[in-house]
Amino acid sequence: MTKSFSIYLDLIRFSAAFVVLLWHSRPLYEHNLTISQYGHEAVIIFFVLSGFVIAYVTDTKEKGLKDYAISRAARIYSVAIPAIIITALVDFSGYTLNSSAYPEAYRAWDLAGIRVISSLLFTNELWTLSTQLFSNVPYWSLNYEVWYYVAFAILTFVNGFKRWLIFGVVCLFVGPKIFLLMPVWWL
């Protein structure tokens, strides 16, 4: 991949992420930009490009499961840990200053430990679960992405019948919500 093509892909990913940000901030503004209605499509674009980039990096730079796992963990936790900390701090402060600004769903501080642990383990969205990270609605996408990393690793680094057995077990573990969107990541 050339440097200019890599920059081009980064620009598309950044643009898609920005559209998602606009979509999530729509409730804050009376007049929405037309482009903000394409948040769902932007998520799909982001997932497709992520799958492409991960496949490329795995093919050219990461020489085994260990390299792949270390790279993916570093990438995902460099986003997840700050997101968890910042969300908890902002929500706690915001709720303390003006609790009426927070819908009932975001006030579940009695489940704070469960929300944080499931967010660190990326188990928020398994099967019918939707354990939201306080007010951080977009955090679901990290959960999906992690399980796509796992599935990709299995299909890339495990051979023979064991590959399909482990892949099947992971699909059964994560459930249909995550599994049904998985092909988008591999387009």
Residue ranges of model-derived segments:
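Short, Lys/Arg-rich N-terminal segment immediately upstream of the first membrane anchor
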Residues: M1-S6, D67
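Functionally critical transmembrane alpha-helices in membrane proteins and complexes, commonly lining
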Residues: S4-D59, A74-A83, F179-L180, V184
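Short alpha-helical catalytic segment bearing the HExxH-like zincin motif
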Residues: D10, Y68, S141-N143
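Lipid-exposed faces of alpha-helical membrane segments in multi-pass integral membrane proteins
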Residues: I12-L22, A42, V48, P82-V90, ...
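Transmembrane helix-loop junctions in multipass membrane proteins, especially transporters and channels
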Residues: L28-N32, T60, F92-P103, G160-F161
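Specific transmembrane alpha-helix
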Residues: H40-E62, S141-G160, W164-L187
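Membrane-interface helix-loop-helix regions
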Residues: A55, Y77-V146, V150
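Short amphipathic alpha-helical coupling elements at transmembrane boundaries
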Residues: D67-S71, R75
